[in-house]
From Swiss-Prot:
Molecular function terms from GO: NADH dehydrogenase (ubiquinone) activity; NADH:ubiquinone reductase (non-electrogenic) activity; quinone binding
Name of the protein this chain belongs to: NADH-quinone oxidoreductase subunit N
Species of origin: Ectopseudomonas mendocina (strain ymp) (Pseudomonas mendocina)
Cell compartment(s), UniProt: Cell inner membrane
Keyword field: Cell inner membrane, Cell membrane, Membrane, NAD, Quinone, Translocase, Transmembrane, Transmembrane helix, Transport, Ubiquinone
Length: 494
């Protein structure tokens, strides 16, 4: 790869628009906070910024595919995952607004505005990750994504659990990043270049132990961020301690971005999957599927349950990653989209049920007993989400799972498929358990509840939209499939 001076033209700027708009929004929000604290204004600015960033994807895709410096590759693949990250962030922002008080008038003790700023910064990191094609781009994106999340997790600092979760995540995340960097150093020592493509080329000539170790260590760093099995221990604690909208962000936007970059690495340099690394990934996938589902059986806390189930879901995604032929890239795109939808819905219901003033979120299962008799529509939303996570037909989750299984069959990964089917069967059980709880006749206990008019607020409207989408995509998935097909073709064509 000959190094030439980077010409930076208007086209490059257009290609970078989503990222630039997101960063500009962060700056605007920061200045607005500095000028005058106003929760509603901050919320509106953030939503505007994220919507503009989503819209700016259109002109950006117009000039794609385009290599912007050696670090970023803006193409349809990047565009698709950028859209997912931005949409997830947008949903988390509306949830944050509902969570931090909205119109309920009860003031959140402390400053509310910075949370929006952190979400914007983190989203910018996600955008960098989705388009990274270089180890440095990957690392910058990863840090920009995860550093603001430390603050977000500990945002309800007057709540001991939240603070503990933030510190725990920060320490473990640093360890994960250290592994990642070490792996990168080993790769660079061997390949002499940090671009994914160059690494792939030098790997194709023959793999040495150094390279395999380097990739293995990088995988450890990324597996930590995706909470795959041996590195999953932080997940339930952090999900439980973090404020509900932040848990939603962690489960959706941050994981999608990391998975996108992992997929890109695998697509561009297939040699990274060679040898014992493939077996290692297979083991991690099987372990994630089984552990995630089995540990979720024991949970009496909805957020912890969702944490464990997200471990299992990323185990399923690894199956498609290992298959990484034909269908697999599309399968991953579809699965991530449906997973984001359903996770946002599930965490959204928890968000609307909780207020940060009552000391902790409404995440214990008993708080949802008989919810149907008090908030029927909210219950309907949560029920659809649980069905979708379990992968029941007529919901979006089924389409994703179906595609992943199809990809696995295509690549003939029978062991992995066995684990998937077993895991899904266990999964149905604990999702049903949540649903049964919702419809129980309840003893009259006083506890916190979603406000009566939740459906007329930003957060509630977003939830209803998500529920309808989850159902609609389950019945008529064609639009999503076409989108993903376009994005996947580009990834394979390179």
């Amino acid at each position: 790869m000959e190094h030439h001076a980077v010409e930076f033209t208007a086209q490059h700027l257009i290609a970078l628009l989503p990222l630039l708009v997101t960063c500009m929004s962060a700056i605007v929000v920061m200045l607005a906070i500095a000028a005058r604290r106003n929760h509603a204004l901050t919320f509106v600015l953030t939503v505007l910024g994220l919507n503009l960033a989503l819209l700016s994807l259109l002109p950006a895709m117009g000039v794609a595919p385009l290599e912007v410096t050696a670090l970023l590759q803006i193409d349809r693949f990047a565009g698709y995952y950028m859209a997912l990250v931005l949409a997830a962030s947008l949903a988390c922002v509306t949830l944050t607004h509902a969570y931090l008080g909205g119109q309920s008038g009860k003031g959140y003790p402390g400053n509310r505005e910075e949370l929006y700023l952190l979400i914007l910064l983190s989203a910018a990191g996600g955008l960098v990750l989705a388009s990274a094609q270089h180890l440095v781009g990957l690392f910058i994106g990863l840090e920009l994504l995860s550093v603001p999340t430390y603050g977000m997790i500990a945002y309800a600092f007057f709540n001991k659990r939240s603070l503990e979760a933030g510190i725990k995540y920060m320490v473990l995340s640093a360890a994960g990043s250290a592994f990642l960097l070490f792996g990168m150093a080993l790769l660079y020592a061997e390949a002499g270049d940090m671009g994914f493509r160059a690494i792939g080329a030098s790997l194709a000539q023959g793999s040495s132990l150094l390279v395999e170790l380097g990739i293995g260590m990088m995988l450890i760093g990324l597996a930590f961020k995706l909470s795959l099995v041996p590195f999953h221990l932080w997940t339930p604690d952090v999900y439980e301690g973090a404020p509900a909208p932040v848990a939603a962000f962690l489960a959706t936007a941050s994981k999608v971005a990391v998975f996108a970059v992992l997929l890109r690495l695998y697509q561009i340099s297939p040699a990274t999957a060679g040898g014992w690394l493939n077996e290692l990934l297979t083991l991690i996938a099987i372990a994630s599927i089984l552990f995630g589902n089995l540990l979720a059986l024991l949970q009496n806390n909805l957020k912890r349950l969702l944490g464990y189930s997200s471990i299992a879901h990323f185990g399923y995604l690894l199956v498609a990653l290992i298959a990484s032929q034909g269908l697999a890239v599309e399968a991953i795109g579809v699965y991530l989209a449906t997973y984001v939808l359903t996770s946002l819905g599930a965490f959204g219901v928890i968000t609307l049920m909780s207020t940060p003033y009552s000391g902790r979120d409404a995440d214990a299962l008993y708080e949802y007993r008989g919810l149907f008799w008090r908030r029927p529509y909210l219950t309907a939303v949560l029920t659809v989400m649980m069905l979708s996570l379990a992968g029941i037909p007529l919901t979006a989750g089924f389409i994703g799972k179906f595609y992943v299984i199809a990809a696995g069959v295509e690549a003939q990964l029978w062991w992995l498929l066995g684990a998937m089917v077993l895991g899904s069967a266990i999964g149905v059980f604990y999702y049903l358990r949540v649903m049964v709880t919702l419809f129980m006749r309840e003893p009259n206990l006083h506890r916190h509840d979603a406000p009566f008019d939740w459906g007329q607020r930003a957060g509630g409207i977003m939830l209803l939209v998500v529920a309808l989408l989850a159902f609609f995509l389950g019945v008529y998935p064609q639009p999503l499939l076409e989108l993903v097909h376009n994005a996947a073709l580009v990834a394979l064509a390179q």
